[in-house]
């Protein structure tokens, strides 16, 4: 068994050694939950890595979105080059779930686009968890959604070893049952081919390696790993384990049992709908389900097969579905990053999913068992999670309750940077005072971030500052990803001096050039001016050694008092540490990366407009990718009509892209 081994020129410093020791002591004493309070720039990921190395336990790290998960995955991959670091997020580039809008009698079919690379990485993650112990899986919160049963996944695995006998027809049949396709011409991931005494398999978890099985009669003589593009032999293997090309593979007996269960539920549901005098729903459900049953009988699968997952996994109604958590060993370790965001997300996912599916069941589009194809309820996740370390600069109520309010702190930054100075000024005449502060900050060569309470206020303030000839821009939720990057680049370069926003902490801004963060109407209690929001916003000025924060308030609220007191407490600890060790804080100098050319155009295009506005396929693809992100956002917000409109626009643009290419 391989042990975890960090490869890095850095060693734990500042608060890190103490924090690592405290967390490990808590794990050793069987504490189920611990809280690692790490401020921005304190080295939380490096601290997590050292805890993993010291405990030597398989680990799952949950992040609240794909972007953050990818960041952590990249860092862990560089720290643990000799161990299995895997990435497990939703493999959909675009996902429009089935939905029914009763008020317009509109049924929207499921539509999705699967990212092959992410699907490969998901297979690599589950395979690693079943094959070895030195595994780190970095996942988004989507890991609480249903996945194929690990028992069936492992049970159907084909174990190959040289010297063993494998009847040829049986082996080929086993590969087909694993949902591998025979393709003797086009050899790609998830396929196998037969040439004489050789069988080549392209495993589902590889993109650039395949296996060649060399037989003498029924005896397997050799297993060679080779490059599927060049045919070059890369290694000779002692064994090979072939897992399913899908996480939902199952033996024929399981399929037959599932069909019987579906038929039984269908009859009960049809009787119920008839008793409710719902002929349309009765006919619709019978027609749709009978078609699915025919497909299952003939092919072993059907469109939307996941809606029958309860029958395939042998679970009872209401029982939790199998998820990635069932692939983890009993002694696994869990980190929940940015837990103040991740935990509420986990809590909300079940209700959103059930609300949509309940409508489908009520109107005869699905059987009630479709409700069991779902994410875990929060209580189920809480029950299944192994020993857990929550990680956040601003812990939420659940984490604090679970840990009894005890936190392990990471306050000292390796750079020596201090938390910013906080100044409270009256909200009366706040705009006039802000203008004076903007002048002073710009004269020092720094930038300014201003956060307001409403969109109208942000728009008016931006327009007013522009009238006064200040280079000002406005960042809001309708700004698309590439435009947002462009605005931030302009801010860092000095093309923009002032950036106004409503919820800047959500935007995740890290601007080393920011010398001032101004929080208008800081005394208006609510989500945008809560203790957590204020601390996160104050942190935007922590990348600059001269960073300041001004909170405009006519009264001292509990949130302001707690946020400012906490910032001052951290600042004093950091100052004392720097004085003791002779550290001089220095602003972080990060390179400003150039953006590719970006076309700002209206999203409502026809083919002719697409040809006119995009003079090459690359530019058109950029816009198509942007629309896909908008579709994903609309679908996740349950805005199904908008998602369908965007999907129709995409089809037109994709036809144009095909012609352009």
UniProtKB/Swiss-Prot annotation:
Binding-site positions, ATP: 38-45
UVR domain location: 621-656
Q: Which UniProt keywords apply?
A: ATP-binding, Cytoplasm, DNA damage, DNA excision, DNA repair, Excision nuclease, Nucleotide-binding, SOS response
In which residues does the motif Beta-hairpin occur?
91-114
Query: Which Gene3D superfamilies does this entry report, sorted A to Z?
Result: P-loop containing nucleotide triphosphate hydrolases, UVR domain
**Which residue ranges does the record assign to the Helicase ATP-binding domain?**
25-414
An example of a Gene Ontology cellular component annotation for this protein is:
cytoplasm
Cell compartment(s), UniProt: Cytoplasm
An example of a Pfam family matching this protein is UvrB
Among CDD domains, the record links this protein to:
DEXHc_UvrB (cd17916), SF2_C_UvrB (cd18790)
Record GO biological process: nucleotide-excision repair; SOS response
- Its Gene Ontology molecular function terms? ATP binding; ATP hydrolysis activity; DNA binding; excinuclease ABC activity
- What sequence ranges are listed for the domain Helicase C-terminal? 430-592
The task this protein performs is described as: The UvrABC repair system catalyzes the recognition and processing of DNA lesions. A damage recognition complex composed of 2 UvrA and 2 UvrB subunits scans DNA for abnormalities. Upon binding of the UvrA(2)B(2) complex to a putative damaged site, the DNA wraps around one UvrB monomer. DNA wrap is dependent on ATP binding by UvrB and probably causes local melting of the DNA helix, facilitating insertion of UvrB beta-hairpin between the DNA strands. Then UvrB probes one DNA strand for the presence of a lesion.
Q: Which family does it belong to?
A: Belongs to the UvrB family.
What HAMAP family does the database record attribute to this sequence?
A: UvrB (MF_00204)
- Subunit relationships: Forms a heterotetramer with UvrA during the search for lesions. Interacts with UvrC in an incision complex.
Entry note about domains? The beta-hairpin motif is involved in DNA binding.
Indicate what this protein is called per its UniProt record.
Answer: UvrABC system protein B
The species this protein belongs to is: Rickettsia conorii (strain ATCC VR-613 / Malish 7)
């Amino acid at each position: 068994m391989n042990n975890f081994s960090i490869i890095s020129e850095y060693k734990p410093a500042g608060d890190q050694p103490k924090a690592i020791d405290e967390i490990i002591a808590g794990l050793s004493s069987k504490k189920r939950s611990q809280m690692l309070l790490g401020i921005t720039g304190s080295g939380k990921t490096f601290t997590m890595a050292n805890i993993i190395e010291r405990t030597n336990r398989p680990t799952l790290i949950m992040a609240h979105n794909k972007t953050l998960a990818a960041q952590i995955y990249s860092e862990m991959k560089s720290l643990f080059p000799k161990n299995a670091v895997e990435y497990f997020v939703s493999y959909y580039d675009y996902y429009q779930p089935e939905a029914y809008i009763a008020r317009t009698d509109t049924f929207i079919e499921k539509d999705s686009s699967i990212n092959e690379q992410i699907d490969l990485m998901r297979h690599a993650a589950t395979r690693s968890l079943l094959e070895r112990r030195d595994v780190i899986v970095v996942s988004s919160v989507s890991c609480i959604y249903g996945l194929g049963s690990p028992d069936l996944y492992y049970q159907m695995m084909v174990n190959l070893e040289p010297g063993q006998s494998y009847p040829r027809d049986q082996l080929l049949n086993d590969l087909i049952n694993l949902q591998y396709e025979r393709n003797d011409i086009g050899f790609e991931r998830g396929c196998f081919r037969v040439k004489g005494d050789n069988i080549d398999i392209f495993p589902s978890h590889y993109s650039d390696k395949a296996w060649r099985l060399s037989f003498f009669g029924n005896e397997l003589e050799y297993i060679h790993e080779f490059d599927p593009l060049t045919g070059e032999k890369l290694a000779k293997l002692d064994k090979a384990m072939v897992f399913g090309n899908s996480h939902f593979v199952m033996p024929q007996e399981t399929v037959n049992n599932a069909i019987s269960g579906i038929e039984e539920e269908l009859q009960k549901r049809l009787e119920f709908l008839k008793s409710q005098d719902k002929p349309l729903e009765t006919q619709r459900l019978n027609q749709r389900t009978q078609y699915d049953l025919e497909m299952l009988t003939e092919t072993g699968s059907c469109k939307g097969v996941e809606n029958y997952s309860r029958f395939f996994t042998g679970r009872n109604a209401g029982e939790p579905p199998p998820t990635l958590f069932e692939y983890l060993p009993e002694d696994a370790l869990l980190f929940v990053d940015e837990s103040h965001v991740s935990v509420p997300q986990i809590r909300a996912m079940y209700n959103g999913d059930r609300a949509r599916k309940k409508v489908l069941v009520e109107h005869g589009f699905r059987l009630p068992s479709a409700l069991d194809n779902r994410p875990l309820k929060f209580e189920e996740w809480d029950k299944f999670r192994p020993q857990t370390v929550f990680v956040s600069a601003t812990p939420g109520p659940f984490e604090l309750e679970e840990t009894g309010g005890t936190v392990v702190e990471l306050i000292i930054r390796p750079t020596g940077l201090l938390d910013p100075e906080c100044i409270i000024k009256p909200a009366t005449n706040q705009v006039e005072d802000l203008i004076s502060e903007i002048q002073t900050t710009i004269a020092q060569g720094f930038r300014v971030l201003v956060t307001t309470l409403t969109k109208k206020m942000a728009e008016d303030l931006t327009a007013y500052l522009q009238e006064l000839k200040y280079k000002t821009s406005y960042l809001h939720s309708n700004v698309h990803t590439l435009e947002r990057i462009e605005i931030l680049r302009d801010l860092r370069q000095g093309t923009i001096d002032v950036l106004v926003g409503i919820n800047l902490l959500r935007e995740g801004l890290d601007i080393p050039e920011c010398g001032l963060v101004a929080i208008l109407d800081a005394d208006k209690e609510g989500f945008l001016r809560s203790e957590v929001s204020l601390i996160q916003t104050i942190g935007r000025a922590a990348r600059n050694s001269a960073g300041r924060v001004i909170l405009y308030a006519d009264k001292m609220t509990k949130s302001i008092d707690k946020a400012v007191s906490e910032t001052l407490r951290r600042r004093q600890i950091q100052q004392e540490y720097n004085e003791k060790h002779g550290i001089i804080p220095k602003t972080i100098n990060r390179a400003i990366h150039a953006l590719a050319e970006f076309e700002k155009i209206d999203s409502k295009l026809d083919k002719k407009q697409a040809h006119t506005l995009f003079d090459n396929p690359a530019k058109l693809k950029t816009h198509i990718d942007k629309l896909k992100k908008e579709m994903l956002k609309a679908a996740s917000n349950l805005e199904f009509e908008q998602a369908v409109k965007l999907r129709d626009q995409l089809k037109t643009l994709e036809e144009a892209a095909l012609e352009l290419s």
